[in-house]
């Protein structure tokens, strides 16, 4: 890590956290307005992130495969960093996000999660928790909203094994109960923004581009083993390809 990289990371973090704080404070009245206004806040937040990456880190964002953006689906997103949570909220037109329960207790921002219709769950994967998640997801789908879930349940290191961070049954339960296609989503954001890292590493991306790719949908009707196998295979294969290109 060079001193230049440290300075760039510091400037990016100041940009992102300062503007995020300003956004959530200025937009507080949106918590009492129709859902459209929360949708607008999400898109602005995503834009703040994208502009900060461009200005301070020299990174572009490439979206590969946007043919599902006008459909109601379940987005099963690879989880490597905080980046995809923020960016995908704007990209996927404010989907209903499956989040860990602790996030709704964050000062002020927790209210935004709730107003946005996020579904807080206990990550124990208990049957009761899964049933509550499914019930709330079905209500969102009836309103025409897509669902966003992180199948491994937590942010994982870039080179981690699925033996250590398996694809959890919660995503299959959602798929089987909601009966809509699942779109696997792969990306390489973990290379520049590792889990819990204040320091960002733009030089880890040889192309200077964070790529997010929407893969072919998994149709309804598969059994648990076949579904999880296909989801893991598609997501991990494409994620590894994108990472290898940057090394």
Residue ranges of predicted features:
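Membrane-anchoring hydrophobic helices of lipid-metabolizing enzymes
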Residues: 1-73
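Catalytic core of membrane glycerolipid acyltransferases/transacylases, capturing the structured
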Residues: 20, 24-40, 56, 71-126
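Short gly/ser/thr-rich secondary-structure transition/capping motifs
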Residues: 55-62, 130-131, 194-197
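Short acidic-hydrophobic, aromatic-tinged amphipathic segments that line or gate anion-handling sites
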Residues: 63, 119-122, 220
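A cross-family acyltransferase "interaction/gating" segment
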Residues: 108-110, 145-148, 159-226
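A membrane-cytosol interface segment of integral membrane proteins
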Residues: 118-141
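Short acidic, glycine-rich surface-loop motifs adjacent to enzyme active sites
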Residues: 151
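Short active-site segment of divalent metal-dependent hydrolases/proteases
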Residues: 155
